[in-house]
Amino acid sequence: MAFNQMRSSGSTTDLNRLNSSSISGGGNINISNGGYGNQQLNAILSPIKSSSLSSMSNSSSYSNLNTLSSSKSFNSLTLIENQNDTTTTTSTNNGAISEQYQQLLSMIPKYQTKQYESDVKILFERNTPEQMKQMEFKKRSEIEDMKSQLRNLIGNKYRDLVEGSDAIVKMKKSTELISDNLSLMQSELKQFSEKRNHFRKGVSQDNLKLNKEKEIQKKISIFSKYCKFLIDIPEVIWRSLDSNDYFEVCVFFLKSKYLYSKITNENNLEIKRLLSKLTIIEKQWISMKQFPIKTIGYSKLFLNESTSRIIGTPIEKYIGSLSTLILFEKKSIKETFNEFLLSRRSVLFNSILSKDTNRPIQQTIEKMFQFLKMSIYYIMVLFYPRKYQTNNNNNNDQPEEEEQDDEKLISNDYQSKISKFKSNLQQYTSSLSSMSSTTTTTNSPTFESKMINKPVSEKELNQLPTLNFTSSILESTFNWRSPYLKECLKFYKDVSNGELSINSSGSQQGDDYQDINTNNNNSNNNNSGIDSQDIEYSLIEFDNFNSNFIFKRTSEWIEEIIEDFKLNLVQKFLIDIKSAKELSSLRSEIFDFILDFKNIVPFIQPPQTNSLSSSNSSINSIASPSVSLTSSTSSPIIATTKATVLTTPTPTPTPTPTTPISWNRMFSIICGKDMKYFLNIFEDIFLVKSESIIMDSFSRINLSKIQSDIFSQIKSEDKNFSEFLWFYNQDDPIQSIKNKTNGITPSNELFLTKINQLYNNIKSDFIYLLNDNNINNININNNNNNNNNNNNNNNNNRSMIITSQPKNLIKINEILIKEYMKKSFYKSLNEFTTSTQDRIDQLILLNKNKTTSGTTTSTNLKKDEILFISKLSKIFYKHIVNNPNLYFLNSLNIFDTTNISNCSTSFSKSNSINILDTISSPPQPPPSPTHSSPSIQRHTNNNNNNNNNNNNTSPIINNNNNNSEILKESLPIIDKLKQQFYYGCIVWVNEFVGDYSQILKQDLFNHDWNDSDRIKTWEKHIIQIESNGHNHNNDANDGGGDDDATVNGVNEHSTIIYIPYQTSPFITSYLMSISLEISKFSLNTIDKNILRFIIESITLNLFNIVNDLLSTSSTSTTASTSNLTSNNTTTTIKFNKEGYIQLLIDLKYIGFILFGRELNSSSSKKPTSQPTSNVIIKDSIFKKAKSHYQSIISTKNNVDENIELQKQQQQQQQQQQQQQQQQQQQQQQQQQQQQQQQEQLSNNIVYTFNQIIELVEKNLDPIDLAFYNSYIVKFIDQTYSKTLTLFGNFVYLHKSIVKPEKKQSINGGQQSPPLATTSSNGISGGKGIQQQQQQQSDLPNPMQLLKTNTKFQLFSIDTIQTITDAIATAPTTIPSSTSNSIQSSANNSAIASPISTIDYRNQQQQQQNNTNQQSLPSILSPTSASSTINTFSFMGKKISDLMYNTTKK
């Protein structure tokens, strides 16, 4: 309560002081109503006859120290005037009040008073007395309301004024009591003096009494000054705390403590009696005891407050706040130093680097560097010790022996503490010296070794400015050298010892504090010297303070700030940086801030111009621009100590040429961090941000979305490559031909163009950042061209040197940037392959859940999407392999200018041509000097499992050795794309092969294999049997019929067999449909592994179909039957010999198309241990894709089976659960057996197909099979030669060629049957068989075409026109003996046209109805609509028909 009352009373006296004008001097002190302080107390303590007081100015000085120096001499308290004087003073005060009232009235203008009088007169004239009473009552009530409102307002908002007024009332009562006691004392003293004078004897006794009275009077006057100081000083301390003047607070508190100890330890009875009556002194001291705690809290708050308030704060305020911690909280120098660092760190992160700031990052970083610079500068001038102290002050002029004698004034206990401290300090310094002397082999030197390597010279320390500041409250000027904190402690020591003078102008000095009691010096030292002992201990610690501790702790402080900044705030400040261009601009600005470390510290003055005034003005103008160096106040203050007298200037050292201290040097001295350290730190920050920008840029490139968007816009030429192949592009025919050659559809080209543009945009963005590595020095010529004076030219040259020196320090790590790009590209590509694979898996799993009505549409969409994904995957990974620089694989040439010259703009046509030229083949080694043949080149490509026979290398790839290493590093990600391509193709192949195989199965089961009339449309062959003098009778059933006599050229020693003219139409349609599906993929770029898998899928499907067809057949003399069970229905299929012959021919024809000469029809042939490489898939990536597909299919089958089993379990009873488990086990066993069979079959596809043929051959008689075998082989060779071009997709692997044979005819002139088969008859005269005449057929030989390395053969318009003209002029008449066979052949050839297998039956019926209406020339005429079908397969059909007609001719 006492503390709060003093606080409130102080605020009240402030308001009163604003109205005070002056205090008159003279005999009595007249205090006005608005005077400062307690009126009664001032009337009692200051009515002493003295000289006039100095007037108080109206400025903002609130110090009460004027009362301490109010007079030069004081009279005794016996001269205090009596109560009459007090009453006189009171009456004079009342008169003064009335005079003030009259003055206020005189200030009102006369016209206003006249106006008021006239208004009152008019008011009384116009209103009755009752109305006047009502008006009076109304006005009085309003006044009362206003009074109550005013009371509430004052009570709520101005409570401190009310409390202050209450305190004033209490003080009035206490002063009245004091005045009464003093008046009583005065009367008694008068009586005593009268008695003493009455009994005085002699002149000597009178002189002694007079001297004694003077001494007592002097002591009482000193006592009155002390009391006045102690009563008024709390208000001053409060004002100093409010203005953060902690240095003044400490001075006042130490002085108050010293004075209080002087008063309380006084042995004079008169003074003790006076002190017992002045209880306010004790109360004031009790309230002042709280100031240390309050000051500590305020000083810490000041150190940790926001930067907006401490910008421009003078350094003396920091000195006062830090010295408060040493003085009041008893902290050591190290603890104070740590507290300073912690406070600076909190200010930095709470204000400058706060997350709530909205300043640009450039301003934030600039303020951070400025803050760090000022912090290092404060450490340098406040804490950094000097090895040799020069004597600047008076108390340092004494020799060292006198300084050692000061220890006698310190107590024994404290001397023991100091001696122990010094011994420990010596041990510590000796250990440091031993550590520094030992040499270490480590790469990183210790802090001590760093300091030894770069010691601070005395010249550099002398460059630090001398602090020269003036305290307006103390009215003193201080001149301190660094470290300033040590000088401050010395001043506190002098204050605590009472070594200061009381004066009014600062010129007169005197030691009056020793006169109050000359007999108790020891007790005073014991009571008031505790603070001086603590300060002495701190000074000793400061003298032995090691700079290595500053070095180490400051270095840790800088590292902690940088680490917190990197971990917590970098992302916040750099969140708005979205591109490398913005990052490059920010990087250049921040590096400019760091390069300022080369500049000289602006507070430093070189020794040559070491002037006290110039150094002081520089530090005060820069460090504290808001504080004025000259004080305008004139209030009296406590003067400085002997150590801070201005009459002892600092000696100027001898000028020596010394390099000025730069910020870089100061940082290296204090913390060992220089410009390179901050450059490396921010370089790491920029690298982290660059990585974040790269990751964000690549994450925005969603390859899966681009793929899906392009798929939603694909056209027919994208779905079917054959349509795109024959499409003529008028805009860019050259590029169109290149794309067709490389198998690139418009959608593929659009995909590559988009991703190339996006990737090049990323590269172009980072060009701005990487171009900083090639920054030239600042153009010196431009700066030198300025015709300025010499000083400006020197400054320009200096700045240019500073900015050009660290050129090598600001290079960004380009290798890491490239690695980040490579890593991000791998990540995006991995996400693309994963999402695409998941999409294919989803299509497979959802396909079976489609409804029956939408099955066809959904299946087509699914196949189109899967085919599109597989095509795109292959084009993509081929493009990556051929362009490693473009796709970040080659870290050395990612930013090659040849690849990104036009990166900032969209792709031009020429640029896209360069990119897409080399898609078809991976990079090949350069050719040897001796050119290899095409066959050798093709053999090399086959060994590498490449489906392309192109030996062209990519023009972009120049260094093949480096590219091979690059491809090895990036092989896993390329393999993923390749596996995705294989996976899509596997799904696509299984889909369309399964669909067409199902149709073929239906055709096979619906076909009449027991038709005995089929031989009417077959070709007849007569086989002559040699008799050797004996007749050989053959069974008609075995040879197809024998005659005893010669009938139609057939004698009794010959046999007739029939061979079909061509294969079954559904077999041709089956192969044609699959060939059309394959043509959707460019044959030029299709992978051989895909063709092998198509053949494998066809073989497995045929094996299952034929096995089901012949599994239950039974052979008889006439026919055999086969039972098919499907959907609980049984179909009986009957076979005769001709049916088996037809099925055998069809299967052998398919086998020869698929495998060529590798097919072995012998049933005893076993599978080879090492299958042929043409049909076996050895690629491990393909096997991975196939295993994944099988796992997805098994998952789907298991899900379907589980659903069916759940439905059955709900319907069935609990008794049937065991049966269901048995069934499940059986199903699993069957599935495992089927999988094992399929694996065994897939290991050797040729052997599997031979097993299919073996199934049919088992149902034929071996003798019949021996008769038919040679003719079947000849038929298959001829048919294969005709359809070689049609089914080139299958022939592409084995490339088997059948040599053409000559036709044979009978001498009798009878024409042989069509299709160039051989017929024989006997020779006239019975001389045996004559040699038949042969006729050469003009069959085209495609052997040379297959041996070439051409990707595909395009037929010119002239060639096609010649072929169609030959067909148009071909004869249409044929012999009558073969008209039926020709008609059948024409019907079958119409069936073999490239039509859709699904609509096969409808088209077959239409063709049979229109056979007689259409002729062959009209179908193949150039003007016919069918001749304009732009498919490669149908062109092959036309060629085969032409070959058939020429052969028949």
UniProtKB/Swiss-Prot annotation:
- Where do Low complexity bias regions lie? 517-528, 930-960, 1401-1414
Protein's name in the database: Conserved oligomeric Golgi complex subunit 1
Residue stretches of biased makeup (Polar residues): 1305-1322
Q: Which InterPro entries match?
A: COG1
Any one biological process term the GO annotation gives: intra-Golgi vesicle-mediated transport
Where do the coiled-coil regions begin and end?
A: none
Organism, per UniProt?
Dictyostelium discoideum
This protein's assembly is summarised as: Component of the conserved oligomeric Golgi complex which is composed of eight different subunits and is required for normal Golgi morphology and localization.
Q: Which UniProt keywords apply?
A: Golgi apparatus, Membrane, Protein transport, Transport
> Where is it localised?
Golgi apparatus membrane
